[in-house]
């Protein structure tokens, strides 16, 4: 293929591709995902293929005469691993069609985060004998120092190492070469406050130091084993910068962030998964309301070159309500690219398939912008409304634009409006009756716009009727 296509395969980035016409042939060049994504791009250019939702795929149909495009293009994603934000698009087929690939995690129990207990230290197995050494004082987290007992710490680390090997053998044994294993603390629980953990926090200013000191030796041994057992393959061990362990162990020296010492520099095969749980997601990370979280990310980038990012785009206190992160997606994804983020999960309504039309819009934008953060945002919106809402495009676009305008008004007139993913903003004061009635009018207009289709095309009518809400 190198000679016939004239393409140097070694120059194609990971997940990238080149599509090139040579005489009467079209070569789609790349490896693994790259070939797949190149094939979908070929379909896009040749047959107007575009996926907008699970049940809405645009494609030129009943074509009888088609001239082959003269291809000479190359592309690769700005963010290497792009996880779908909403549940209905998480299947392998949907991810492939949207050029997403969040299925990078190896797990036996299906719990790919907050899994330090389930995946590595199940209480049913260890708590009766190791309760006072391996678990935090309240039993809700691990103790990453084993109460300062070096022998017990070594046993804990070896337990993690052996578990990592088991998971790799399980997946690689069936030719499923995924690239990450999460070793992440439990959710909504304080970190250990034993004397040894407290001393680590006192010295480094963060609970994260104990986690780094725990995992770095494991990562070194794991890399040696992986190189010997599966040469040419790489697997990240991923730890959280989250809640009580969100702060990075750095200091300021000559006006620059630097590691507090060399022991907290994270090994190359350890991914640092930053999840700014308390950030304001009605504003982008460059807004003054998120200065703390942007600075925290900068600090972590000093001690890790292997960054993962978890953001939020849903209201988890009112799951069915609008949560207007549309204005921040492009900006935040550009930030992720600029930080060389390896994996992005923009957490939406991940555990349900009952999505609204605007959830699907977020999923579409999530896919397009995480591949190309500089994509034309306005054009993406236009394409989605035209193809997804069809005859109801105009009233649904008015509804969408008016809602976003109202949210901008709320943010401009109420500086204390909370924007965390678990904040409650859905009050009569913020959304008065006359505003809601205006939006209901747009919805009624949308139903009227599709009414003629009821007799002409009942199948499409029913589909569109369900999308209007």
Residue spans of the language-model regions?
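Acidic, His- and aromatic-enriched active-site or binding-groove loops in soluble protein domains
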Residues: 202-218, 256-282, 365-375
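Substrate-binding cleft/loops of secretory-pathway carbohydrate-active enzymes
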Residues: 237-276, 320-325, 355-362
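Active-site beta-loop-alpha junctions enriched in small/polar residues
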Residues: 84-89, 186-188, 240-246, 275-279, ...
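Feature activates predominantly on carbohydrate-active enzymes
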Residues: 12-223, 231, 298-322
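Aromatic-lined carbohydrate-recognition surfaces of secreted/lumenal glycan-active proteins
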Residues: 215-251, 307-314, 344-347
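Structured mid-domain segments that build the active-site/substrate or prosthetic-cofactor binding neighborhood
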Residues: 144, 155-162, 166-170, 291-394, ...
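Short, well-ordered secondary-structure micro-motifs within conserved domains or adaptor modules
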Residues: 1-10, 86
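Catalytic domains of carbohydrate-active enzymes that cleave complex glycans
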Residues: 368-469
